[in-house]
Swiss-Prot record:
Residues the record lists as binding CTP: S57, R60, H147, K167, Y176
Name assigned to this protein: CCA-adding enzyme
Organism for this UniProt entry: Methanocaldococcus jannaschii (strain ATCC 43067 / DSM 2661 / JAL-1 / JCM 10045 / NBRC 100440) (Methanococcus jannaschii)
PANTHER family: CCA-ADDING ENZYME
A GO molecular function held by the record: CCA tRNA nucleotidyltransferase activity
NCBIfam families in the cross-refs: cca_archaeal (TIGR03671)
Annotated catalysed reactions: a tRNA precursor + 2 CTP + ATP = a tRNA with a 3' CCA end + 3 diphosphate; a tRNA with a 3' CCA end + 2 CTP + ATP = a tRNA with a 3' CCACCA end + 3 diphosphate
Length: 449
């Protein structure tokens, strides 16, 4: 068996994940064609546009193979009202795509923008205000052109390839993406980390010294903001803090969960210890399959019809409901082995695995030593019939719930008042599904991916 060095592994990975020069040239030509069409529309209507800018990983040459999205930002003067920006922005975006015989729809971020397809390329045309470094943003997307301008002048070809390696590593681990479902690393965060540490391997090595609350302030910040005082920077109560060079009041790493922060540290260590190309090939998915191929406890799903709201709203509400239910489950002494939530277009799924589904109807309650008069009297008053063992008071009580299904039936029927019910994920609309076999569980997971 041939053992590859880290350098050989990374070279092989890069050959697999880096887009070809020909593909990048085709993308640039198509992006230029769309930008030319936008300027054509702007001139025809005398719209107050200051700049049209190609942004994102494709524009900065940090994209992975088969990731050829075209993100175009249309920059307005700050004197334009937000209503006018939205109206003109949508007119420009829809008309440009129509003239190129593409298809489109309207999506929403901090304000509406046009998402479409032109000759096989996914295209976003986003209106925003043109601002300078240090200026107050008007909408969240105003930062994006500055992100691009900050990075494009600092990322050379070598660093771009290092970013690609990091993205591929994170993608394989299931840690790439800052959406509410993934809670991982954004592409912009990847670029900043490589800029800060200089290479993929240096980043992995330095990550071994990270702890919760790790803070990164890029040296470039001091070049942009001459009078910045690090002691007066905004404080963040988050596991990983990377100050945005474009907006020092923003933590670029805020979407990253504590567990995913720790996963990155752990798997970075494993890769450095035992380098393998497998870390770049759906590693998390394979690991999950291994973990699933085991004996299981009792599993059930609470299946709730999904309201017509975006993931950014539905996932936090599912998590809030599951945490609230978990408190009730633990209070009733059932042991949770695993719990998670996910959603498709039609339903929200809250999943649990329990050590056992049924407990004895009788529970033993341990009280204080008999010598502690006041506590002993309170225990006696609460339980009535008590007995003494090893100088302590004990009592037998009847459990309110001896079967987990009975507890969930009361949740679905609305009989428990101490469940915090979010606006868009109501357990009273739910259906309890028991997963009795391993095959049934695997099929369910497949359907819900």
């Amino acid at each position: 068996m041939i053992v590859l060095t880290i350098e050989e592994i990374l070279k092989e990975v890069l050959n697999e994940i880096k887009p070809s020069k020909e593909d990048m040239e085709k993308l640039q030509l198509k992006a230029n064609e769309i930008i030319d069409k936008i300027w054509e529309i702007v001139r025809e209507n005398s719209y107050p546009i200051l700049e049209v800018l190609l942004v994102g990983s494709s524009a900065r040459n940090t994209n992975l193979k088969d990731d050829y999205d075209i993100d175009i930002f249309v920059l307005f003067d700050k004197s334009v009202s937000e209503d006018e920006l939205e109206e003109i922005g949508l007119k420009i975006g829809t008309e440009a795509i129509k003239r190129l015989n593409g298809s489109y729809n309207i999506n929403y971020a901090s304000h509406p923008y046009v998402n479409g397809e032109v000759d096989g390329y996914e295209v976003d045309i986003v209106p925003c205000y043109k601002i300078d470094f240090g200026e107050k943003i008007i909408s969240a997307v105003d930062r994006t052109p500055l992100h691009h301008k900050f990075l494009i002048s600092r990322l050379n070809e070598r660093l771009c390839d290092e970013v690609r390696l990091l993205k591929a590593f994170l993608k394989s681990l299931g840690l790439y993406g800052s959406d509410v479902k993934t809670k991982g690393f954004s592409g912009y965060l990847c670029e900043l980390l490589i800029l800060h540490y200089g290479s993929f391997i240096n980043l992995l090595k330095e990550a071994q010294n990270w702890r919760i609350g790790k803070k990164i302030i890029l040296k470039d910040i001091f070049e942009i903001y001459k009078d910045v005082d690090i002691n007066k920077l905004k404080k963040f109560d988050e596991p990983f803090i990377v100050y945005d060079p474009v907006d020092l009041n923003r933590n670029v790493a805020s979407p990253l969960s504590k567990d995913n922060f720790c996963r990155f540290i752990f798997y970075s260590r494993q890769f450095l210890k035992n380098p393998s190309i497998e870390f770049f090939k759906d590693y998390a998915k394979k690991l999950e399959e291994i973990l699933e191929n085991r004996e299981h406890g009792y599993r059930l799903i609470l299946k709730i019809p999904r309201e017509n709201v975006v993931d950014d709203i539905i996932y936090p509400q599912m998590e809030k409901l599951q945490k609230s239910i978990n408190k009730v489950i633990v209070k009733n002494e059932f042991v949770i082995l695993n719990s998670k939530c996910f959603a498709d277009d039609n339903y929200c799924y809250l999943y649990w695995e329990f050590l056992v589904y049924e407990l004895p109807k009788i529970a033993l309650r341990e009280g204080p030593p008999v010598f502690e008069k006041e506590r002993a009297e309170r225990f006696l008053k609460k339980y009535g019939k008590v007995f003494i063992r090893d100088c302590k008071l004990f009592a037998y009580t009847e459990r309110e719930y001896s079967h987990i299904i009975d507890l969930f039936k009361d949740i679905v029927n609305g009989n428990l008042q101490n469940i915090s019910i979010p606006k868009y994920v109501n357990p009273r609309n739910g259906k309890i599904i028991e997963l009795n076999s391993h095959g049934e569980h695997k099929q369910f997971n497949k359907e819900c991916q």
